[in-house]
Amino acid sequence: MAPLVKQLEADPSIESIVCVTGQHREMLNQVLELFDITPHHDLALMTGNQTLNGLASRLIASLDDVLAAEKPDRVLVHGDTTTASASALAAFHRQIPVGHVEAGLRTGNLMQPWPEEMNRRLVDVISDLMFAPTAGSKANLHAESLSGRVIVTGNTVIDALFMTVARIDADAALRAELDARLLFIDDTKPVLLVTGHRRESFGTGFERICSALAELARRGDVQIVYPVHLNPNVRGPVQDKLGKLPNVHLIEPLDYVGFVRLMQRASIILTDSGGVQEEAPALGKPVLVMRDVTERPEAVAAGTVKLVGTRRESIVEAVSALLDDQGARDQFACRINPYGDGHASGRIVAALAGRPFEEFAQGALVQSLPVKAGSNIGSKHFV
């Protein structure tokens, strides 16, 4: 959302008001500082171990106060978080039109991911403007016969990535500062970057993931770098199974610029993150996704992503195949990224202002790929 906020700030025809709820506080503060954004409202609603229902009720009540005070003509929400669904519902209750950024992502299974799949479906039902990242997402929305206008824009996450990469590339001092945080990396060995935080993997799923990483670490010819999520459901099994392995580097979560630099230096990325599924292909990196289904089937069809699930054997087999074949890794640098060209935010602002614009040009390419809502682990698109 940050690139869109900056585009809105720069447009004299639109007055924008930024409200943050405090969900994912550590990451939020980093992004606000990086993009020089000062929220007009910071609700600071997150507390430890709160239930989703408790969070949603507090969000709706607090957001209702903001809407009553500001009386906006439109509310924009992003993605599939509880913040997004609660914001859309609060706006609906006040009959304020809603625009959904990153609309139309689907797995077809309400429990994968949970609760995100239901969150984004709810937001799309409420929205009268849906900014779909791809033609595949647009097709999902049309298949549901939703009444709102659907516009293919590309994803704003690619805007943020390109802005950040340009900053890193242009600033040698910044690169040196970022690399100084990664002095433990041995450039003579491939780097496996791991991120994992999905609720549906808590418990048995993370136990299997950690067992797979421990087995891969025994190869000795790979370095595993894992910025460990702050959630204790993640930290517990990760520390127990991987904390004492010499070629496994468990580090604190990085700020966005630092994480982009780490992705640039990675050889393979193993993740359950939706955003990383979009960002890493833009950097030419192989992505193995530790989920059984994805709402981003375009990447599977394009060959930039492979679903490996959370079974130990599947993870080990997929990572080993790439570690043992430099040529297979190199192929990813030549593949298409179907998620954006860095101009999604500009298209969204033009649509809001009523100015002419062209939809995401790669939409025709994505539409030609044989994908449906959600690709599962049995998909044959990956070559």
Residue spans for each PLM region:
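Nucleotide-activated sugar donor-binding and catalytic core shared by glycosyltransferases
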Residues: 1-226, 231-383
